[in-house]
Amino acid sequence: MPRSQRNDNFIDKTFTIAADILLRVIPTTRREKEAFTYYRDGMSAQSEGEYAEALQNYYKAMRLEIDPYDRSYILYNIGLIHTSNGEHAKALEYYFQALERNPSLPQAFNNMAVICHYRGEQAIQQGDPGTSEIWFDKAAEYWKQAIALAPNNYIEAQNWLRITGRSEDWE
């Protein structure tokens, strides 16, 4: 039984019903419907912390989905799982792939910045201020791109850019 038919919470059930109605009304191919079902089941598993199951569903969706925009969200969600698992290098790869297909994903830029900032903090703890500055500069670059796409979001990042003197070419 597909995961979407096993949802226990109201929001997931509502989303599933709405998605099923849309799939019936909007003209789509069988392949597109199947890709969306895997994507939806992946999101459901991911929201419950079932990352292995979510990844399986996302990989199946990727094999079926041909639309670059839709693929960007699948790749982004795979990146989220790798971020949650602490696999930052892998997460960055998936965020890059998502942005190649859809350069208007501010959340991918934000997540890349967060990873770079984290690595900068790690470098400081390891007594390597030079490397930390490289990571912080990279974080600033990604946050500026996220903010350019969503100027009313990422307030903490905007403050960090100002406080650290990295906002000069952004504001």
Curated annotation (Swiss-Prot):
Family as reported in the entry's similarity comment: Belongs to the Ycf3 family.
Name by which UniProt lists this protein: Photosystem I assembly protein Ycf3
Function: Essential for the assembly of the photosystem I (PSI) complex. May act as a chaperone-like factor to guide the assembly of the PSI subunits.
Organism: Psilotum nudum (Whisk fern)
Pfam families membership: TPR_1
Classification via NCBIfam families: PRK02603.1
A biological process term (GO) from this entry: photosynthesis
TPR repeats by residue range: 35-68, 72-105, 120-153
Chief place of localization: plastid
Compartments reported by the entry: Plastid, Chloroplast thylakoid membrane
InterPro entries in the cross-refs: PSI_Ycf3_assembly, TPR-like_helical_dom_sf, TPR_rpt, Ycf3/AcsC/BcsC/TPR_MFPF
